[in-house]
Amino acid sequence: MAKKKEVVRVAKLQFNAGQAKPGPELAGLGIVMPEFTKQFNDATRERSGEPVPVQIIVYKDKSFDFKLFTAPTSFMLKKAAGIKSGSANSKTTIVATIKKSQLEDIAKYKMPDLNTKNLEEAMHTIAGTARNMGILVEGYDDIVKAREEAKLAAKEAASAAAFEAKLESDAAQLLAENKQSAEVEVIKEKDKGNKDE
């Protein structure tokens, strides 16, 4: 039986498919960088344009093995939706919709890296990521309801921001008039019941 190699380091990195180059992220691993980049690029050449997560196992003798993973879910969703970035606030801004068939394709693609072998569970997981990015799934999400909720949340956020700005302005005006410091505490609606007790 062959002696098992001693692992000295395990690193998780990400490179564009077929485009890994020697650099600082690899230098710290103590492997022969050109050898890794050649093997990685050969193994990922057909996945052109994809970011490819990779786990590199480094052994004491400076040899290595690596394992490739599927592209990140966010990348696949943005690609399916035809957008460059997700929503900064998915509760108030919906940036795109995708079809249920696209969701299913992404779930099938991601299955090797998910901790489920059930397609429906995988789709549910991917749909959750999509919602967090401001992407809705036709035939899976209630799009009309989600858009209405987003409009309401955006209106509430704008109203709260305007109210807070007015409070800050009023506090600054009081300070200027009195030329002394004062502490201003904002009491939210849900806090009112607790203060009165």
Swiss-Prot record:
Taken from the record, one Pfam family name reads Ribosomal_L11_N
Tell me if Amino-acid biosynthesis is a UniProt keyword of this record.
no
PTM comment: One or more lysine residues are methylated.
| A Gene Ontology term for the protein's cellular component | cytosolic large ribosomal subunit
Q: Which InterPro entries match?
A: Ribosomal_uL11, Ribosomal_uL11_bac-typ, Ribosomal_uL11_C, Ribosomal_uL11_C_sf, Ribosomal_uL11_N, Ribosomal_uL11_N_sf
What protein name applies here? Large ribosomal subunit protein uL11
| Keyword set includes Hydrolase | no
Which SMART domains does this one have? RL11
Keywords of the record, alphabetical order, are: Methylation, Ribonucleoprotein, Ribosomal protein, RNA-binding, rRNA-binding
One GO term in the molecular function aspect is:
large ribosomal subunit rRNA binding
Q: How does it assemble?
A: Part of the ribosomal stalk of the 50S ribosomal subunit. Interacts with L10 and the large rRNA to form the base of the stalk. L10 forms an elongated spine to which L12 dimers bind in a sequential fashion forming a multimeric L10(L12)X complex.
- Tell me the organism: Mycoplasma mobile (strain ATCC 43663 / 163K / NCTC 11711) (Mesomycoplasma mobile)
Which family does the entry's similarity section mention? Answer: Belongs to the universal ribosomal protein uL11 family.
User: What biological-process GO terms show up in the record?
Assistant: translation
CDD domains (alphabetical): Ribosomal_L11
